[in-house]
């Protein structure tokens, strides 16, 4: 059964340019190398919700567990924390369309 990891965070004020460069050059290629397939990304314009919600899929729980326990995942998410606050993620069953 395919699973989706939903990640959310807020971009640190004044770090937007560096954040976008990191995401495009390192974060997305990094999660792809680990086996996560990006599916969607959402930007919250209004309201009291995370500024960014991003999703990525894996084919099964074993693959996801391996990724989430890897030193690569830890290093990549720690690096992301240089540019964001309130990073969190949850794992759900993958479906088509927007998921929260």
Language model features with spans:
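Short acidic/glycine-enriched loop/turn segments that link adjacent beta-strands
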Residues: 46-50
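Short, low-order "capping/linker" segments at domain edges
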Residues: 92-100
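An amphipathic, aromatic/His-enriched active-site/gating alpha helix that lines ligand/cofactor pockets
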Residues: 24-39, 57-92
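Short, solvent-exposed loop/turn elements at beta->coil junctions and helix N-caps
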Residues: 41-44
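Active-site-flanking beta-strand signature of metal-NTP-handling nucleotidyl enzymes
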Residues: 3-10
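Short, surface-exposed ligand-recognition loops at beta-strand->loop->(often short) alpha-helix junctions
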Residues: 10-22
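Short, flexible segments with low predicted structural confidence
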Residues: 2-3, 35-36, 52
């Amino acid at each position: 059964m395919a699973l989706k990891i939903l990640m959310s965070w807020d971009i640190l004020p004044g770090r937007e340019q560096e954040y976008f460069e990191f995401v495009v050059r390192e974060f997305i290629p990094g999660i792809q190398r680990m086996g996560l397939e990006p599916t969607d990304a959402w930007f919250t314009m209004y309201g009291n919700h995370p500024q960014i919600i991003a999703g990525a899929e894996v084919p099964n729980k074993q693959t996801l567990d391996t990724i989430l326990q890897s030193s690569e995942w830890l290093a990549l998410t720690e690096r992301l924390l240089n540019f964001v606050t309130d990073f969190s993620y949850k794992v759900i069953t993958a479906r088509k369309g927007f998921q929260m």
